[in-house]
């Protein structure tokens, strides 16, 4: 979603290379539209995307902790520039509950206080939702 980014001709960003970035050492009057398998894999698994999902989740939690409905609204506004519809909201609430249950099981052996456990679970579930939002077709392709 970036129109311009500063790039040194001799140093390519590995993330952009996987998205079939142009060769910066040659001029090009026109680029052909391409889709390569690594694009989807980078968006699903890359460290960069996971970091961005975590940053977005922390930002949203700062203002909307304990309010899943408001969190879902904010995720949709930030990722897609629109509110979720009723079905999407329902699916997201179900997803947050499911992820919270998974994270609760994963953290069950840790020595966390109840408050720490609850906030960690909420943060991780919301991070998962942000990651999902980054992988929606609507995030990649404008209608």
Describe every region a protein language model picked out:
Residues 109-127:
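Intrinsically disordered, low-complexity acidic Ser/Thr-rich regulatory segments
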Residues 83, 87-89:
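Extended, well-ordered alpha-helical scaffold/bundle regions in very large, multi-domain proteins
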Residues 87, 108-109:
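Surface-exposed patches in mature extracellular/periplasmic domains of secreted proteins
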């Amino acid at each position: 979603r970036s129109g311009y980014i500063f790039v040194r001709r001799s140093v390519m960003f590995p993330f952009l290379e996987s998205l079939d970035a142009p060769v910066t050492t040659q001029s090009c009057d026109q680029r052909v539209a391409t889709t390569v398998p690594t694009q989807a894999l980078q968006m699903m698994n890359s460290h960069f995307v996971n970091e961005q999902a975590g940053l977005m989740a922390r930002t949203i939690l700062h203002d909307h902790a304990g309010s899943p409905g408001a969190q879902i609204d904010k995720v949709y506004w930030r990722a897609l520039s629109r509110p979720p519809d009723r079905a999407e909201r329902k699916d997201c609430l179900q997803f947050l509950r499911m992820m919270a249950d998974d994270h609760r099981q994963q953290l069950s052996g840790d020595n966390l206080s109840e408050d720490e456990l609850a906030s960690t679970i909420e943060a991780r579930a919301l991070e998962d939702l942000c990651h999902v939002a980054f992988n929606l077709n609507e995030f990649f392709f404008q209608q």
